[in-house]
């Protein structure tokens, strides 16, 4: 692999650093641009948890694609949360890459939030040849939060309910340990807190009288329903909550007349595999879909959606993507 370090100057004068990974120093190549998931991310798609590195999956994707004789462009993400800025940066990055002498045509690879970025951008670039969409949201924030709050969190609460009476008590949560799953997002943002003495307590919206218990049916479900109906209401719990009632990508997908490969793990603990099916259906004859048993949001091995903390993408995924590319883009 030959690596060409590049710096992109944006219209506002700010700079983005990236690299073009090439099979050889000379020649023109079909070039896959990698678009990150949500939050802070670099050209490696580094995911960290508890002070350690969980994965750098863009390194593995790039290595696999370059071996298959594709070039890869990846970059250090500048903006963490404002989707309009993220898309604007991605558009300028794509325009820059399209003009490089080594680039014959471009392909989009989006992971999670990157799926939204890809489907928003692709119509601006007539030299785009294909899209690879991994673990993306089809129907917007409401479906995203419905899966996490109504399905996965309810499943976890029932698992924690020692009395099987749909009433959760503080003692049911004493063995919970924070991790990087969507369940921890629910537990530590929406359910659990501490009092002035540092003791565990429940959110006042679930336990307004401070009795140390709440009902799944009477307390949790109404809160979940409120957030699903209007995800912007999450702002009272998290400052980086969605500031929009985004309805998803299906309208954009229906307009795309390019080969599309949809990838999703059946044990994804953040985005329901149903979303992948919706994307593939919207693309009609343009799409192929691969659903991977036992893999999670990062297409790494995961035993359950409730335990999806991310991890190293499986080699099988890269092999399947390369096979699809050889068949549909060559």
Task: State the predicted function of each range.
Residues 258, 271-281:
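Short alpha-helix in the alpha/beta-hydrolase fold that links the catalytic acid
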Residues 295-299, 303-330:
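Catalytic active-site module of serine/aspartate enzymes centered on a nucleophile-bearing elbow/loop
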């Amino acid at each position: 692999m030959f690596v060409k370090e590049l710096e992109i100057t944006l219209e506002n004068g700010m700079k983005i650093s990236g690299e073009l990974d090439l099979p050889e120093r000379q020649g023109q190549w079909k070039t896959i641009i990698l678009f990150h998931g949500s939050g802070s991310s670099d050209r490696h798609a580094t995911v960290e948890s508890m002070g350690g590195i969980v994965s750098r999956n863009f390194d593995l994707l790039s290595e696999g694609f370059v071996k298959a004789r594709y070039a890869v462009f990846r970059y250090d993400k500048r903006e963490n949360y404002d989707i309009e800025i993220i898309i604007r940066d991605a558009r300028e990055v794509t325009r820059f890459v399209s003009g490089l002498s080594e680039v014959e045509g471009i392909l989009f690879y989006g992971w999670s939030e990157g799926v939204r970025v890809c489907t928003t951008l692709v119509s601006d670039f007539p030299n785009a040849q294909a899209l690879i969409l991994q673990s993306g949201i089809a129907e917007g924030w409401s479906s995203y939060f419905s899966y996490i709050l109504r399905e996965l969190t309810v499943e976890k609460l029932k698992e924690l309910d020692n009395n099987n009476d749909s009433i959760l008590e503080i003692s049911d949560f004493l063995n919970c340990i924070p991790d990087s799953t969507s369940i921890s997002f629910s537990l530590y943002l929406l359910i659990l807190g501490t009092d002035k003495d540092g003791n565990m307590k429940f959110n006042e919206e679930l336990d307004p009288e401070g009795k140390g218990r709440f009902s799944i049916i009477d307390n949790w479900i109404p809160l979940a329903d409120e957030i699903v109906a209007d995800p912007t209401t999450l702002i009272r719990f998290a400052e980086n909550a969605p500031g929009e009632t985004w309805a998803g990508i299906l309208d954009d997908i229906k307009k795309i007349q390019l080969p599309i490969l949809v990838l999703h793990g059946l044990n994804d603990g953040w985005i329901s595999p149903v979303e992948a099916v919706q994307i593939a259906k919207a693309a009609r004859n343009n799409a192929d879909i691969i659903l991977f048993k036992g893999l999670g949001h990062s297409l790494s091995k995961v035993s359950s959606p409730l335990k999806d903390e991310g991890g190293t993408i499986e080699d099988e995924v890269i092999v399947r993507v390369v096979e699809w590319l050889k068949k549909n883009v060559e």
